[in-house]
Amino acid sequence: MGAYHSEFRRSIESRDEFWLDAARAIDWSTMPTRGLDDSNPPLYRWFPDGELNTAFNALDRHVDGGRGDQPALIWDSAVTDAKRTYSYRELRDEVARFAGGLASLGVEKGDRVIIYMPMVPEAVIAMLACARLGAVHSVVFGGFAPRELAARIDDARPTLIIAASCGIEPTRIVEYQPIVDQALTMTTHQPGRIVMLQRDAKPAPLGPRYLEWAELMADAKPVDPVPVKATDPLYILYTSGTTGRPKGVVRDAGGHAVALTYSMNAVYDIHSGDVWWTASDVGWVVGHSYICYAPLLIGATSVMYEGKPVGTPDAGAFWRVIAESGARALFTAPTALRAIKRVDPDGKEIAKYDLSAFRTLFMAGERLDPDTLGWARDKLGVPVIDHWWQTETGWPIAANPRGLEPMTVKPGSATVPVPGWDVRILDPEGAELPPGRQGAIAITLPLPPGSLPTLWNDDQRYVAEYLSRYDGYYLTGDGGYRDEDGYLYVMGRTDDVINVAGHRLSTGEMEAVLAAHPAVAECAVIGVPDELKGQLARGLVVLKAGVDIDEETLRAELVDAVRREIGPVAAFRDVDIVAGLPKTRSGKILRKTLRGIAEGRDEPVPSTIEDPGVLDQLRPVLQAH
């Protein structure tokens, strides 16, 4: 039996012993003696008698251990042509002072703080400063519109907001301050203060409740880390639900630190002193786990990149960053590689840079098509490793465990379940399916450390949405199968969440925006395949009777409304006006059927359809793109 199989078996059969062993890699103020707390199923908790501080583990212990001069964070901004490297000592000192500044504004253990910032080092400093105080951060992606920000403010009820004056895109500057101000006109909760990082590209005019970052830091005194219970929340990260208010995924402090530390070694084969680059955004879970926390927890150097794969300035941007930073590995989404491949199909830009330190390319966030995998492998000459996880899980469910036992790559597969994740493929009745049969991907409870213990202030919704479909299992919402070798193939979402360039977005929320237009009687939004972004949202709208409006005008208004309400991240550009939508006799729109037709499948007509003739009218529209 190989290293992977023995480790996986131990993680399932001797769960407590396995994770208490893993917990020894962390410095605890109170070392846990218990692994799993199963006193309140299905709400399981990890390390219930442990206490720690995540920021201490990410910074202070490395300084105390004699590695204070090692680079901790390399910031590379292609959009401002700026760079900055922070040593572990410098980053620790900045975080300790900013935490002191937050404390002077009344932030205490357990308080929530919303962070609305682009890819600047101050975003990581703000996250770690919250962790140092035992406060709970909730980072909101800087591309989200006022309505999305407002919903998160009302759910998290933050003591204060930390923002930047702007984000910088290749062709424009996105001002954040007007978005924050507009969001606060929509909320019932009003945070006391807003700390604003002024960026040279576009400083913001500040009202009375604003305080400049530099002003706060000028008088700030450093504070020591505050120990918290392992089961206390470290952060809340909101994810797209299919309906209703946003879901606040909770990450607890102890399980998070243990699981991320384990993953860096077992999954990514990255260790103290290595340079690691995750090309994502701190507003997403990948940025939380693998830009901010995991690399610092193990004493690696984390690269933080503000820019794009192409256009800042060219398709060689990623290879320049790898060459200049000495990154051993890159973790990004397939969308980024598809964008580079489209502009530089022959890989000429790759040849311009010294990539001798580069060992592995990791991909996740959406399906990695075999064509993109093959192109990257052939042009870069390194293993290209697909893996799969979710906002909810916080770290990989299935991967090629490079630090345990590197396995053969099978294009289209995320390889095998990571130790701790007991993955099953279930039929609609909950029976386990044999190899080769596709079904719902579920995970046997309890979930391992680092995954969500619940949703913010909503145990009931957590149980209803994730744990109620199959008794004793967490439902991932993805479908797939395993082959005879145990490799997992993830085939896509089984709900109405789509994946645009690695970003999970709710089609239901987009439909709500379209339906609000006075000319629209009903609508549907589906995800359709896109060569560059993986999926794109496609809108279908039926007009109200008697409405007289120019179709192009309506299209422009609907696209603008989605951009305004959801944000540019929705990449919503495609909407058709149609005579009707296919429905069941009970009135449910047949979105799965629409998706199948749009993807060119010979979709069977459901027996429950009310009017099969509607599909005949829609086929040419759906297949025209």
Residue ranges and their predicted role:
Residues 140-165, 180, 323, 330, ...:
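AMP-binding/adenylate-forming catalytic core of the ANL superfamily
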Residues 257-275, 285-329, 342-348:
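Conserved AMP-binding/adenylation subdomain of ANL enzymes
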